[in-house]
């Protein structure tokens, strides 16, 4: 079969890597792809939001399955566009992807169906938000309602910070129209964990757990980013917690979406907080996480095509999801200055050192070809993933492998700053 993957980052490189292992697949295309993906797939210069050209390409090449990976096209209806043209597509339709596309929608859904989450209020005008904050307890969390590249969340320690946050999100439109509505949420404490789940509209099957580091700087300081590294599994996500989440979060979320006429098929990313008062939902995403996919997919034993087709066909209940009994750690190699401002176009060397090494992966995020040289082309440049028998070995292997790669403004969070893995 012929597969088209839509996207261009490290997540898409991990997805393409998994698809390339399937005996069922004869040809992979990726639109637009990147310099690393080009080693496994034919990259096509079509943007992720150019639905007309994507559909036309899929028809022309007689694509059997399209995998839509990023949030923007999913929320905008990419799967709907492919399905309308009679092309099988993996991912939620727009009316289900709203669970990520609108934080206000997802919070209201959880409230309506009794799914545990933080207390919150939604606001559509800045004055009301500012008035609410006058009597609020701090710290408090402000969230832009719409998509903001994973950066539309502000944790405010006092009223002054919160006022500045309202101005940034709602008045200055720092996140564009994503800030037309804003969610103000109680600040939760505890350990965060991410659980990606395959869904077929009725059945939901969690993958192995993961935990990511969002802060840009060492010691969990600096601005929130799309993710500076991640590890899997989370040692804090126990069998008992998994069973609780299945009965109180995962299954109820699937049932809630179905009851709302928004059947969810694809990958549901559940961002959870393990608080002193139990596990609560921080956020939902309607797709594989980045960089979570880069540690979860390398540990999956199943043929990913079998699982994706089961999600589309509504037969996920017949799939036995299996993961290796080991660990994986991904360290992001970023451009110094990310996520604010950074230079790009620097040549990258050492990529060939990953060739033929089964338990080491280098997933390209912000790279491109400059002639026949691979150069940096983004804030998050590469994700170096390594496996090990446990998290300690995997982390040591991953940090050792980051030394194999050099480029001029390379930045990683130091091993010393990585949160403990026990």
Provide a role label for each language-model segment:
Residues 4-5, 100-181, 211, 235, ...:
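Active-site nucleotide/adenylate-binding loops and adjacent lid/helix of ATP-dependent enzymes
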Residues 38-41, 55, 98-104, 217-218:
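Short, charged, surface-exposed secondary-structure boundary motifs
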Residues 367-371, 375-422:
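Generic C-terminus detector
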Residues 21, 36-38, 60, 90, ...:
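Solvent-exposed alpha-helices and their adjacent loops that cap or buttress functional pockets
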Residues 1-94:
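ATP-binding N-terminal substructure of ATP-dependent carboxylate-amine bond-forming enzymes
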Residues 246-268, 285-357, 370:
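Active-site "cap" helix and flanking loop/linker of ATP-utilizing ligase/carboxylase catalytic domains
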Residues 156-293:
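Internal nucleotide-binding/catalytic subdomain
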């Amino acid at each position: 079969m012929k597969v088209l993957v839509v996207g261009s980052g490290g997540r898409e490189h991990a997805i393409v890597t998994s698809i390339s292992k399937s005996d069922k697949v004869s040809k992979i295309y990726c639109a637009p792809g990147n310099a690393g993906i080009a080693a496994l797939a034919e990259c096509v210069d079509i943007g992720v939001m150019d639905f007309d050209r994507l559909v036309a390409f899929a028809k022309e090449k007689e694509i059997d399955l399209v995998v839509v990976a990023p949030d923007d096209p999913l929320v905008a209806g990419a799967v709907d566009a492919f399905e309308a043209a009679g092309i099988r597509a993996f991912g939620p339709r727009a009316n289900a992807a709203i669970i990520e596309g609108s934080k206000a929608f997802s919070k209201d859904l959880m409230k309506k169906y009794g799914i545990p989450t933080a207390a919150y209020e939604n606001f559509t005008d800045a004055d009301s938000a500012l008035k609410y904050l006058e009597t609020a307890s701090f710290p408090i969390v402000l969230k832009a309602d719409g998509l903001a590249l994973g950066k539309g969340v502000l944790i405010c320690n006092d009223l002054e910070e919160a006022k500045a946050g309202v101005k940034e999100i709602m008045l200055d439109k720092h996140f564009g129209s994503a800030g037309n509505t804003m969610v103000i949420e109680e600040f939760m404490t505890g350990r965060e964990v991410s659980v990606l789940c395959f869904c077929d509209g009725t059945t939901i099957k969690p993958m192995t757990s993961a935990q990511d580091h969002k802060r840009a700087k060492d010691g969990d300081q600096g601005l929130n980013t799309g993710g500076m590294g991640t590890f899997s599994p989370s040692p804090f996500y126990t069998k008992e917690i998994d069973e609780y989440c299945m009965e109180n979060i995962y299954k109820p979320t699937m049932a809630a979406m179905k009851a709302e006429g928004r059947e969810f098929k694809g990958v549901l990313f559940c961002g959870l907080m393990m608080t002193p008062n139990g596990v609560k939902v921080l956020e939902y995403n309607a797709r594989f996480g980045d960089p979570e996919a880069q540690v979860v997919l390398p540990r999956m034993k199943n043929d990913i095509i079998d699982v994706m087709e089961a999600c589309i066909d509504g037969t996920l209940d017949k799939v036995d999801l299996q993961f290796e009994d080991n660990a994986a750690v991904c360290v992001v190699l970023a451009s110094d200055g990310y996520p604010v401002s950074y230079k790009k176009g620097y040549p990258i060397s050492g990529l060939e050192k990953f060739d033929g090494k089964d338990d080491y992966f280098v997933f390209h995020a912000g790279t491109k070809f400059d002639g026949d040289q691979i150069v940096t082309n983004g804030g998050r440049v590469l994700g170096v993933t390594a496996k090990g028998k446990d998290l300690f070995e995997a982390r040591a292997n991953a940090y050792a492998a980051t030394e194999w790669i050099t480029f001029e403004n390379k930045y990683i969070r130091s091993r010393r700053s990585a949160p403990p893995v026990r």
